[in-house]
Design a protein with these regions (language model features):
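Residue in the alpha/beta-hydrolase core beta-strand immediately N-terminal to the catalytic nucleophile
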Residues: 72, 116, 139-142
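Conserved HGGG/HGGXW glycine-rich cap/lid loop of the alpha/beta-hydrolase fold
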Residues: 23-89, 106
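Conserved alpha/beta-hydrolase catalytic His-Asp/Glu region
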Residues: 178-220
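Catalytic active-site module of serine/aspartate enzymes centered on a nucleophile-bearing elbow/loop
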Residues: 265-298
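Conserved loop-alpha-helix segment in the C-terminal half of the alpha/beta-hydrolase fold
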Residues: 60, 231-278
Length: 298
């Protein structure tokens, strides 16, 4: 089913009108797809403040080789706008854990598994746990600056206990600004912290519009910290894995990449020269070549 009502075509940034997949619990998942049905499937998982539109730099070029599928996770645009963030019969809680199961059921609903999965930032963490929890659905895995802390000896597994205090304080301030109506300032604080100072001010209009559309998810996300990566979980990843970071990515992402490179059997790491956290946008050509080449190489 195509989704047309309730969405201004200009909000799609030139992407095709999204389809809707209705899962077995009634949850409706908006997604866009490019390429052809007979092509191998590549599933893209967005991160914080984003939705399927984040993958525009990939959905066009990579459609020459793959059937590219990019869903918007529940609560993210346009799900909230159209009332799709809730299951039939009740509200759906925002959580990374629910998003993992949601993606698993989404792949099963499409009947296309196993698929090649690409996840960025928070979406990288969700994609990682998708591969751990549903190994039969993931053919290969690409993690780009995966979000989440790295477990240390003595940690109890809760990500909130291992994130540095300054990061938690900054995130609380960003949520406070957004909640008080100073959305632009809150987004600037958060986005610059996960990329580089000044990144928000230099961001394209489309990225800013997308972040504004998803600003309400930030406070929900901060109340649901990502789990810390550990060797035990990483050892359960059974598929070929490519891990990408940017030369200028913040340390918290590079730390996660370094740990996962050592823990995931056979994982390959590539650093994109000159790139920071938004590598698939700012260095789309290099990113696309890596992603396309990873599937061929595997």
């Amino acid at each position: 089913m195509k989704l047309l009502d309730g969405v201004d075509p200009s909000q799609l940034f030139g992407l095709p009108a999204p389809d809707i997949a209705t899962l077995d619990d009634g949850l409706q998942v908006p997604f866009v797809q490019t390429g052809h049905e007979h092509q191998e499937v590549m599933l893209f998982v967005h991160g914080s403040l984003c939705d399927f539109r984040y993958w525009k730099p990939q959905l066009g070029p990579l459609a020459k080789q793959y059937r590219c599928v990019a869903p918007s996770l529940s609560h993210y645009w346009p799900s909230g706008v159209l009332g799709f963030g809730a299951m039939a019969g009740g509200s759906r809680q925002f959580s990374w854990d629910a998003h993992v199961d949601e993606l698993g059921r989404f792949i099963e609903r499409l009947g296309v598994g196993p698929v090649n999965v690409v996840g960025h930032s928070r979406g990288g963490c969700v994609a990682f746990h998708l591969a751990v929890r549903y190994p039969e659905l993931v053919k290969s895995l690409v993690l780009a600056d995966p979000g989440g802390a790295v477990a240390r000896p003595g940690d109890d597994g809760r990500a909130g206990t291992v994130l540095p205090a300054p990061i938690n304080a900054l995130r609380a301030k960003a949520a406070e600004l957004i909640g008080s109506g100073d959305v632009d300032a809150g987004l600037e604080l958060f986005v610059d912290s996960v990329s580089r100072p000044g990144f928000w001010a230099r961001s394209p209009k489309e990225f800013k519009a997308m972040a504004m559309d998803n600003a309400n998810t930030l406070a929900l996300q901060f109340r649901d910290p990502l789990p810390a990566y550990d060797a035990k979980a990483a050892g359960r990843v059974q598929c070929p894995t490519l891990i990408i970071d940017g030369e200028k990515s913040p340390r918290m992402f590079r730390d996660a990449v370094t740990a996962l490179e050592g823990w995931i059997d056979g994982a390959r790491r590539v650093t994109i020269e000159g790139a920071s956290h938004g590598m698939n946008v700012t260095h789309a050509g290099a990113f696309n070549r890596l992603v396309a080449g990873s599937v061929v190489k595997f």
